Amino acid sequence: MSNEAKCPFHHAAGNGTSNRDWWPDQLDLSALHRHSSLSDPMDRDFNYAQAFEKLDLAAVKRDLHALMTTSQDWWPADFGHYGGLFIRMAWHSAGTYRTADGRGGAGEGQQRFAPLNSWPDNANLDKARRLLWPIKQKYGRSISWADLLILTGNVALESMGFKTFGFAGGRADTWEPEDVYWGSEKIWLELSGGPNSRYSGDRQLENPLAAVQMGLIYVNPEGPDGNPDPVAAARDIRDTFARMAMNDEETVALIAGGHTFGKTHGAGPASNVGPEPEAAGLEEQGLGWKSAYGTGKGADAITSGLEVTWTKTPTQWSNNFFENLFGYEWELTKSPAGAHQWVAKDADAVIPDAFDPSKKHRPTMLTTDLSLRFDPAYEKISRRFHEHPDEFADAFARAWFKLTHRDMGPRARYLGPEVPAEELLWQDPIPAVDHPLIDAADVAALKAQVLASGLSVSQLVSTAWAAASTFRGSDKRGGANGARIRLAPQKDWEANQPEQLATVLATLEAIRRTFNGAQSGGKRVSLADLIVLAGCAGVEQAAKNAGHAVTVPFAPGRMDASQEQTDVESMAVLEPLADGFRNYLKGKYRVPAEVLLVDKAQLLTLSAPEMTVLLGGLRVLGANAGQSRHGVFTARAQALTNDFFVNLLDMSTEWKPASADADVFEGRDRATGALKWTGTRVDLVFGSHSQLRALAEVYASADAQEKFVRDFVAVWNKVMNLDRFDLA
């Protein structure tokens, strides 16, 4: 018998063929089970916000300032300063953010984990994080990796003479990779046009992606698919940066500002570079890209394969990027690694060498740098920045702050002494509470008025759901606070049933106005609070209709934002294209509806049991978009019963597709053939999928009605308060 056959761990957990191998199209619920307490090493009562507030941030920054110019032999600093490396580290931590679903970004320190830690575009950032380890070790739990990566980028800028806009802490670390769709390609940096291409038609990038190739943060610096065409590259830049919420001015400022510092690395052919961290040997201890070219570091370093230093001041803030961009004509050349780049024609050697003070080089640029000169819109902005350095500095400071804080959500989450006082439109500002809040007696009185207003349980519940369910746990945007459901663009979204919504809001506004007018001492109720309170009243009434007396928790303190405080274009990305909880699809999609339901549930930070009980409850409460009857498996309308589950699992019903695409199904009596119900893929998956059926069976059982109501109320309350960071 071979030694391998004798191995006692040959059949260890995790080995062998997986369910995913057998059934690759099986609905995957794993995204709903990540980041549980089982993967978190911190004590259950650990509160990162409290720990950060006690941190001596000035001391951390002093240590970071010292680190910038303390070059280590195992990874020497370019020009004697790590600033450029750390700016790239922070940029690439934040730069994965995308507006379509709010995923990516710096908020959880995901750069530490696969796949991001091994993306080609993040090559050698493992060294940057390892340089930071002594500081992280020193301050421990008081500063997360997520905050430290961004703070280090800020300090890098400040140490090189740049005045930043500010810094906010509050990014708590997670301890495992996020389940994010980064594309379908099976090869790093696969070019467009392949079988798994993210592009279609006239170079239309697949949603929700925001990078041009697998393993890149934004664009290919050599140009589209390596084609060194600055004008074509500008199209890619504009598309990808817009998908990260950056306009043309912010884009120019970020590229030019970031490329004022440091250099790229392409001393030799990429064939000299070893595997990325996740593929490297144990002895590398989490480091990757070990190079056999020369010393493998310093002047011999290979990262992107490009060998470019943009300015003669690579460790000092200046306007030299634009001076060089417009001061020379440029000719195409190749780096020592064979990558396309550009060199200034007939130029003197004025650019310092990163390691040899006796050497100088001609100015060099990337294809994507030249886009700032040869794209007409970018050129206009670039020339203004060239002529007005103060405007450039301010634009870069603001764009850098936006880049590094875009996924943090509202200002209520910002921590620390360097939070800027200025309120910015992209932060989705909401006025601070400036009046006494309603008390328990007021809550009871308002509920009674709402229930006597003529609005149905369905109208109350669906309106509150429409307001609250815009929340995204990814970038902490959306939610009921602000009452933006009454403003453009939310009031006009198809999923929100604009005509019904207008009726409900008008009724609630009349109740609010009457209540506020009768108060003394300045007490008021906001429409945002009243929308949620009305939904809670609807749930209580539905439970009563089912024979259960419950009190749905309610915490006042929401305020109403104005239209002027709402960026319509920015808010538009929150529009639900699919909301399985309302049985809503705006269009026909390649991705099955049940997959989109799980995606929505994950953005709402729901577990599989929470998703299950919530959907079953919303169906019987009549919360479907357009008053659709699909999935309303009950004869007791607007009563909070477990009928959805009971009737879905009833074996006297036979289900068959009602259309060729199997998006809608008919449930008929097995004996008579009479039509009993209709349902969508989202409805039937709770009887088809083995895990979801197991959950549905819990709520369909004879003893489950009370538990069902209790669990529904709990998850309803959770969703209504997802954006209430003031309650944390």
From Swiss-Prot:
Q: Where is this cross-link: Tryptophyl-tyrosyl-methioninium (Trp-Tyr) (with M-244)?
A: 91-218
Query: How is the cofactor bound, in the record's words?
Result: Binds 1 heme b (iron(II)-protoporphyrin IX) group per dimer.
Q: Which reaction does it catalyse?
A: H2O2 + AH2 = A + 2 H2O; 2 H2O2 = O2 + 2 H2O
Q: Tell me where the cross-link Tryptophyl-tyrosyl-methioninium (Tyr-Met) (with W-91) is found.
A: 218-244
Q: Name one GO molecular function term.
A: heme binding
Name any cofactors this protein relies on. heme b
Residues the record marks as site: Transition state stabilizer: 88
Sorted alphabetically, the keyword list is:
Heme, Hydrogen peroxide, Iron, Metal-binding, Oxidoreductase, Peroxidase
Give binding positions for heme b.
259
Q: Does the keyword RNA-binding apply?
A: no
Q: List the disulfide bonds.
A: none
Q: What's a single GO BP term from this record?
A: hydrogen peroxide catabolic process
Pfam entry (one): peroxidase
Q: Please list the residues that make up the active site.
A: 92 (proton acceptor)
Q: PTM details?
A: Formation of the three residue Trp-Tyr-Met cross-link is important for the catalase, but not the peroxidase activity of the enzyme.
Q: Does the keyword Calcium apply?
A: no
EC number of this enzyme: 1.11.1.21
Sorted alphabetically, which PANTHER family does this protein's record hold? CATALASE-PEROXIDASE (PTHR30555:SF0), HYDROPEROXIDASE I, BIFUNCTIONAL CATALASE-PEROXIDASE (PTHR30555)
Q: How does it assemble?
A: Homodimer or homotetramer.
Please give the family membership noted in the entry. Belongs to the peroxidase family. Peroxidase/catalase subfamily.
Q: What's its job?
A: Bifunctional enzyme with both catalase and broad-spectrum peroxidase activity.
Record-given protein name: Catalase-peroxidase
Q: Which organism is it from?
A: Burkholderia thailandensis (strain ATCC 700388 / DSM 13276 / CCUG 48851 / CIP 106301 / E264)
